[in-house]
């Protein structure tokens, strides 16, 4: 019996959990990882250690793979086009992926197709920033590196002209955006297959702490049904217009005046979709596997009225395993997902999921477990 081989570029926790989702289907994974200690490299049997930025390494890795996918968006698109020319399906393809790699390209395309975004402009020096601010509501202005930023990195909130020079010292292109007056952050997660089948998960609320996702609530509490539907349709439109294959996460601002604006795109499984592992009929990881293999997509509906995901960040309590006894005894329904990473302060090392009919109870259980695992809660 022959099953396809999925080539996964990137060895982080997203690759690890995508691999886990493929196991029940008998799907084989081949992994290109930076080091043998990476999260996914600990669990995938066929691992190649190498540099994803090297075309020769990518070509050697792709031999024997039926399709290539990713757990990050950083692979050079020219290299991916070379793989496609070699006859290897790449999903999502480079023409789609560039919109998750380059914020300037993303903003231009979304504006072209009529998707609402914050006011923005590519800027080359502090004078451009001052001019951009003057044309709008003034300072503060948000500056972002066009490529490479994540979890709050590569983002500056500039309160005046005297701060506008800081982002340019790195010598990389910068995008200026208005500072959006938003009430909360949302995320719309969708999955699309090569032949165009698409499914949408419920829109979630994503709560950030110091620029890093802390808590996700599914579905987003008290979100007007019209706005929720608009967010889902917006994400499905983006996936179709950009030709996305696989999972697409659309990070959104819900503004104080009732609008929804696109913040960022991610073309891979996403932190805002981790709740689906235990809270949806088909997880984001399982549907990503199905999509890249062009299998029929699974049901994205939730299993419970409420699901909460809370990230477990590294703290001063390195022996997290010893915390399992308390967490599991206190909450037999708790789902713990650890990534096999060394515990370092502030590092994402796992997450917990809880679900139920009472939102306050679901959130309390998830936050208690995550805090106890980290060591910030001791009783």
PLM features: residue spans?
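A short linear hydrophobic-aromatic micro-motif
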Residues: 119, 140-143, 173-177, 248-249, ...
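Active-site nucleotide/adenylate-binding loops and adjacent lid/helix of ATP-dependent enzymes
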Residues: 97-187, 191-238, 370
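ATP-binding N-terminal substructure of ATP-dependent carboxylate-amine bond-forming enzymes
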Residues: 1-105, 127
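Peripheral (often C-terminal) accessory segments that flank ATP-dependent C-N-forming ligase machineries
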Residues: 290-379
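Short acidic-glycine loop/turn motifs at beta-strand connectors
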Residues: 192-197, 255-258, 356-358
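Active-site "cap" helix and flanking loop/linker of ATP-utilizing ligase/carboxylase catalytic domains
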Residues: 229-250, 256, 266-315
